[in-house]
Design a protein with these regions (language model features):
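Short, glycine/charge-rich beta-strand/loop segments that flank catalytic centers
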Residues: 104-111, 145-149
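Glycine-rich active-site/cofactor-binding loop and its immediate structural neighborhood
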Residues: 292
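DPxDG-like acidic metal-binding loop motif
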Residues: 29, 117-140
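Short pre-catalytic strand/loop immediately N-terminal to key active-site residues, enriched for Gly-Thr
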Residues: 109-115, 282-284
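A glycine-rich phosphate/pyrophosphate-binding beta-strand-loop-alpha-helix module
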Residues: 75, 105, 115
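C-terminal nucleotide
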Residues: 1-9, 15-16, 24, 32-88, ...
Length: 326
């Protein structure tokens, strides 16, 4: 069995698209991949979707060829296989040097989907890791790149999964920028993290596109906001290293104000942040693409977050997973 944790964005989302620093954390919600030997073909079983796909070696070859000659992810999706296509893509890459015949990989997850937890990255990574173990492949950076191919297919974007896959793999708190790449920070701090689900969210592609439009209309003004988000990320790392939770929470509040200025917040997210401030909680902000979905809240005590459940929001308490995928 292989597991990979979900991921939340502590600071810096959206700005990371423009080369700025982003901070993410692996959390104690997991995707799982189990393997069994059965039959003659390779099989992918998606437990949460009630779907199973069997693939011959010839079909895997065709998927691999189609992926490499695709003109767009939208065109590639027409190949078929539905929600199994990302995993079939990963398998087709790993089948280049090893036979997958007779192997079945089942994927399940306790990470909510389409909320901002990087569930797709965790599922792709757990699947790739379990395949690697079964065929005797090295567990190294190449596996991360293969797992990213699955996340790219899910999000239909070449840029998908860079920080999510790395954070899920390494665990703990990971910083990322396009210039630096991913780096696991030497931080071991206990944070009481509460995830508040504000409801449906816009797709990440939609909110990223909105910021792109804003950037094209007012490059100077938008760049100023993005630079301040970058400064929040850099200051936030230093505060976490010293264990200054109150200071880090204030940075979260400021980061949220800047994200709202970019137009990627929502009425529900703003309500959560407002109530967090009114109740003197340490910090709160959206996590991920925004436009709805989850807010992350730092609090000293569980009872302090009752205000959110009283508003009708679902609240989950999570911790940082420092072990990463395994």
């Amino acid at each position: 069995m292989s597991t990979a944790p979900g991921v939340i964005k502590l600071l810096g989302e959206h700005a990371v698209v423009y080369g700025k620093l982003s901070i993410a954390a692996a959390i104690t919600l997991y995707a799982h991949a189990y393997s069994t030997k059965r039959g003659s073909d390779f099989a992918i079983k998606l437990k949460d979707f009630g779907k199973e796909v069997k693939l011959t070696s010839e079909e895997l070859d065709n998927i691999y060829a189609s992926y490499n000659k695709k003109k767009s992810f939208e065109e590639y999706a027409k190949l078929g296989y539905g929600v199994a296509l990302p995993y079939a893509t990963i398998a087709s890459i790993m089948a280049r040097n090893s036979s997958l015949d007779g192997l079945e990989i089942e994927i399940s997850s306790d990470i909510p989907v389409q909320k901002g937890y990087a569930s797709s990255a965790a599922c792709s990574l757990a699947f790739a890791l379990e395949l690697a173990k079964q065929i005797g492949a090295n567990i190294d950076s190449k596996i991360l790149e293969v797992a990213r191919e699955g996340d790219k297919v899910i999000h239909k974007s070449e840029g998908a999964g860079k920080i999510d896959i790395n954070t899920s793999f390494y665990g703990g708190i990971v910083s990322y920028s396009s210039e630096m790449g991913a780096r696991k920070e030497n931080i071991d701090v206990h944070l009481n993290i509460f995830i508040v689900d504000t409801g449906p969210k816009k797709s990440t592609a939609e909110t990223v596109g909105h910021v792109r439009e804003l950037y094209e209309k007012d490059r100077q003004g938008t760049e100023r906001i993005l630079n301040e988000i970058d400064a929040c990320s850099r200051k936030g790392i230093e505060l976490l290293k010293t264990g200054d939770k109150r200071g880090f929470g204030e940075i979260m509040y400021r980061n949220q104000e800047l994200l709202n200025m970019l137009g990627v917040s929502s009425e529900g997210l703003e309500l959560v942040v407002k109530k967090a401030k009114e109740n003197n909680l340490l910090g709160a902000k959206l996590s991920g693409g925004g436009g709805g979905g989850i807010a992350i809240v730092l609090a000293d005590d569980d009872a302090e977050t009752k205000v959110f459940s009283d508003l009708g929001f679902e609240v989950k308490k999570v911790s940082i997973d420092y072990e990463g995928a395994k």
